[in-house]
Regions:
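Acidic, mature catalytic/reactive cores of soluble proteins
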Residues: 1-607
């Protein structure tokens, strides 16, 4: 049986990440990149699909864990009848090779420990050839991959696994270092695990020290910022949506997607979260990734790209993995990369506008690229698309897609007004009026008193909560207040927000999914804009309670099973948490910042 997602903690080196369960098993690790094949895939199968267990032999051991200070170094404390020990798990910031370090330290008495290492390359399908090198290093090779393990513990082979049993006493420190490298090269050089620990903690402490986050929810926001940093692919600045694939949105269902890619839709809210927290280097790197990935013909702009901007993200299914909680299929790649989703044009142009407002300089070529996007958008904004939820049914005229088309032209006008850029402002103003009138005429249902998911539909959609946030209409407008009331009435489940009604059968998939956590943060943001601060704070604190013991959130939450579902941890959820906390803190307000971008009273930053 699969372990609850709540049982997992994240470690990473800003190029890939691993999930460590409460019982001391690393059940998911893709090497050397987030989107590489997994060498530990027990998360989506069984222990025989790859894992690394390091745990007390005593099944009654009491386990507690935490991240050491403000870092991504995980410390698990083990208490038995005979003693106590801690296991320290981390991945040093990437050097020449990729390492996972595990250090067992004796705290009191003695603790008997077991380790079981099952390496299975290519998502659990390939058993490697394992041998011992003259210096005692264990080496596993299959195809292009090599993994070496170094430890003073005497390892031995048993039934295609590597196992050991040892005792740690008070004052002992027993390290394990596992390193990945290409199989055609010599075994990677060893590292000093204690020095690596000091350097890793220093890396995270120095990074957190740059933060401007203060106030009541600073701890939660800082943990979410650390999670975003861990999900950033450092060589390019791209931010993966999650380090996992195919964790189901509905237990036992088919809504299982690969999220190890970078979505343009996350652009604006991510930039605001990073800039407001003081992380301009990361914001600049994300902006630069955005420009590189989207470069080329505007008609070929995709909704998502690979870590380095790769465009071919071909989707296929792997049959040998039974799936998390037997939820199949297990998918690699994501076919949504080829969908038409018109909202991404507005997201890209809004993100670049917010970067400008934040003082991040852009070149003439960057502006030319944005103008080319706008010229293309003029000819396609009325086309039906798959919408922001990437439905796999027939394309439709989604209301939010049209709203974001308006945002694209609106932000272009503001860029000209605020920064002296050149452009056909009169034509763009006419486009804004045309799109605004079109949305208000066809995207609003007078009988419902609410905006609707798509033109002519009676369905609601949580994306409509973003209409005041992007400045399309003020939160005081009766149509916005009616939309919020309708969503409260029809999309709330146990106080949390569904994306839309999957039972309607319009998205091309069987019904059923959890509540989408980012949508509940959007409702809290709408409450802030409507001056419903008490409602916003209560909802926000309810969402904080959903986090697991180390502060992580998945994509969704199953209110019936009372457990997280969907890919984990989810960047979108953590970005939404950061921005809502900042909105509530009243110091830096991403919702008001973004809405204010639509109006002329915004002032440019001092460079």
């Amino acid at each position: 049986m699969s372990k609850p997602l709540e049982s997992y903690a994240l470690i990473g080196d800003c190029e890939t990440a691993a999930l460590v369960s409460h019982d001391g098993s690393i059940d998911w690790l893709c090497w050397p990149r987030f989107d590489s094949g997994a060498c530990f895939a027990a998360l989506l199968g069984t222990r025989l699909h790859g894992r690394w267990l390091l745990a007390a032999r005593d099944p009654e051991a009491r386990i507690t864990r935490r991240y050491r200070s403000k870092s991504l170094v995980l410390e698990t404390r083990i208490e038995t009848r005979d003693g106590a020990a801690v296991v320290i798990d981390f991945m040093p910031p990437r050097g020449k090779n990729a390492d996972v370090v595990r250090i067992v330290r004796g705290v009191r008495g003695h603790v008997e420990m077991d380790t079981e290492l099952i390496l299975r390359f290519d998502y659990g399908s390939t058993v490697p050839w394992v041998n011992r090198l003259p210096d005692g290093t264990f080496r596993a090779i299959a195809g292009p991959d090599m993994v070496v393990v170094r430890t003073p513990v005497e390892l031995r082979g048993k039934d295609l696994t590597t196992v050991a049993r040892f005792v740690v006493k008070k004052g002992d420190s027993v390290p394990f270092v596992m390193t990945h490298g290409p199989s055609h090269r010599a075994a990677p050089k060893t590292i000093d695990p204690e020095e690596a620990l000091r350097e890793t903690e220093a890396f995270w402490h120095d990074w957190v020290a740059q933060s401007r986050v203060r106030g009541k929810w600073a701890g939660a926001v800082t943990r979410s910022l650390i999670t975003l940093k861990a999900l950033t692919y450092a060589p390019t600045g791209g931010l993966v949506a999650a380090p996992t694939t195919s964790l189901p949105e509905h237990l036992g269902g088919v809504r299982n997607w690969d999220y190890r890619f970078c979505w343009l839709r996350d652009a604006t809210i991510t930039l605001l979260a990073l800039m407001n927290a003081g992380y301009y280097d990361e914001a600049r790197a994300w902006r630069n990734w955005l420009l590189r990935a989207g470069a080329g013909s505007p008609s070929q702009l995709q909704i998502m790209y690979g870590l380095a901007g790769e465009r071919r993200l071909t989707e296929y299914e792997i049959e040998w993995l039974p799936g998390y909680e037997r939820s199949r299929p297990v998918r690699i790649g994501n076919a949504a990369h080829g969908q038409l989703q018109l909202d991404v044009y507005g997201e890209v142009i809004d993100a670049l506008h917010q970067a400008r407002r934040g003082g991040i300089k852009q070149s003439r070529e960057d502006w030319d690229f944005q103008r080319a996007l706008l010229t293309h958008l003029e000819s396609v904004w009325q086309q039906p698309d798959q919408g922001m939820w990437e439905v796999r049914g027939e394309p439709r005229p989604f209301t939010y897609s049209r709203v974001m088309a308006w945002v694209a032209f609106n932000r272009a006008i503001r860029s000209v007004e605020l920064f002296g850029l050149d452009g056909p402002v009169a034509r763009w103003r006419a486009m804004c009026r045309k799109i605004h009138d079109d949305v208000c005429a066809h995207g609003f249902d007078r009988k419902l008193g609410s905006f609707v998911q798509s033109y002519g539909s009676k369905q609601l959609d949580a994306s409509l909560l973003l209409i005041p946030t992007v400045g399309f209409l003020p939160a005081t407008d009766p149509r916005i207040q009616g939309t919020v009331r309708a969503i409260e009435k029809r999309l709330l489940v146990d106080g949390l927000v569904r994306r839309y009604d999957t039972h309607s059968g319009h998205d091309g998939l069987p019904d059923g999914e959890g509540v989408f956590l980012a949508c509940s943060f959007w409702l809290a943001d709408a409450y802030v804009l409507m001056n419903r601060y008490g409602d916003a704070q209560r909802l926000f604190e309810r969402l904080l309670d959903i986090r697991n013991d180390v502060g992580l959130l998945a994509e969704e939450y199953d209110t019936h099973a009372q457990r997280m579902v969907g890919n984990f941890p989810q960047a979108f959820s953590h970005v939404a948490l950061i921005n809502t906390a900042q909105n509530l803190a009243r110091a830096a307000k991403p919702a008001r910042q973004r809405a204010a971008s639509a109006y002329q009273n915004a002032t440019p930053p001092v460079d």
